[in-house]
Amino acid sequence: SGSIIHSMEANVGYSPDKSQNMVLMGGLK
């Protein structure tokens, strides 16, 4: 899952709100 997390972070542009971004990505999934 590490690669997926990395890809997600790269997609959002390494935003400071990682937790929020993960929640948004999880919702989109």
UniProtKB/Swiss-Prot annotation:
EC number: 7.1.1.-
Membrane protein topology class: Multi-pass membrane protein
GO molecular function: quinone binding
Protein name (database record): NAD(P)H-quinone oxidoreductase subunit 5, chloroplastic
Species of the source: Pseudotsuga menziesii
Organism domain of life: Eukaryota
UniProt-annotated location(s): Plastid, Chloroplast thylakoid membrane
One Gene Ontology term, aspect cellular component: chloroplast thylakoid membrane
Family in the record: Belongs to the complex I subunit 5 family.
Disulfide bonds: none
